Amino acid sequence: MASIQANKRLTKEYKNIVNNPPPFIIAAPHEDNILEWHYVITGPPSTPYENGQYHGTLTFPSDYPFNPPAIRMITPNGRFKENTRLCLSMSDYHPEAWNPAWSVVTILNGLLSFMTGDEQTTGSVSTSDKDKRTLAKKSKHFNTYSNFKFKNMFPDLRESNIKDIEREAALEAESKGAQQEENKAQKLATEKATSLDDISDPEDRVRIQELIKAEKDKKDQDKNPGENSNIKSLLCLILAIAIFFVGLIMK
């Protein structure tokens, strides 16, 4: 149970966060336990975590702010072990280094700074930037469909995630369909070229080429019916003039 001072301090800090949200960070206490806080860090630009969504917890001692919280990250991220206490200067691993003036925002900014660096500590892991980017892309899906605590703590954010995931899936399907059409067209062109190369008789090859050209011209005509009609009208006019002059000559 939180002490009166801890309750008062954490309530004040939550109000400050609501009124002045820090960049890349969302944080809120559990409605049934003010000592249990949940945070969401959005991966900053120009880092392997860009647009990733990382959920974790801060577990405060009852005598906060005189002692630091335990820090954990739940979402797979490639930097820290999931659901493992992290050894940081602002965590309960180092109470001797703790400053009571530090706040929730100070702690989470420090966590974000450490996360985007390369320093190792207890609870950290080593992975490639490629792995971190892959996990960043999967993070919203994990939080939305596999992270029970996230769903309970951040229902509005979960709904937003669902819309983002559906939109990305639709764009991916559209892109995949366009790529398949392009591949199909390239395959068809390759097959035509191959079939021409297989024809040994020059005259037969010329005839096939003419057929392919005729087919292409027909498609072009179908695409431009207005232009086609104008050409036919012009030809009819020229033919009529020619017949008129032939009639004059014959007289």
UniProtKB/Swiss-Prot annotation:
PROSITE patterns assigned to the protein according to its UniProt record, in alphabetical order: UBC_2
Residue numbers spanned by region Disordered: 173-200
Compartment(s): Endoplasmic reticulum membrane
Gene3D superfamilies in alphabetical order: Ubiquitin Conjugating Enzyme
GO MF term list: ATP binding; ubiquitin conjugating enzyme activity
Domain named UBC core: residues: 5-154
Segments on the Cytoplasmic face: 1-229
Pathway: Protein modification; protein ubiquitination
Enzyme's top EC category: transferase
Transmembrane segments: 230-250
Function description: Catalyzes the covalent attachment of ubiquitin to other proteins. Functions in degradation of misfolded or regulated proteins localized in the endoplasmic reticulum (ER) lumen or membrane via the ubiquitin-proteasome system. Cognate E2 conjugating enzyme for the DOA10 ubiquitin ligase complex, which is part of the ERAD-C pathway responsible for the rapid degradation of membrane proteins with misfolded cytoplasmic domains.
PANTHER family: UBIQUITIN-CONJUGATING ENZYME E2
Protein name, as recorded: Ubiquitin-conjugating enzyme E2 6
Organismal lineage: Eukaryota, Fungi, Dikarya, Ascomycota, Saccharomycotina
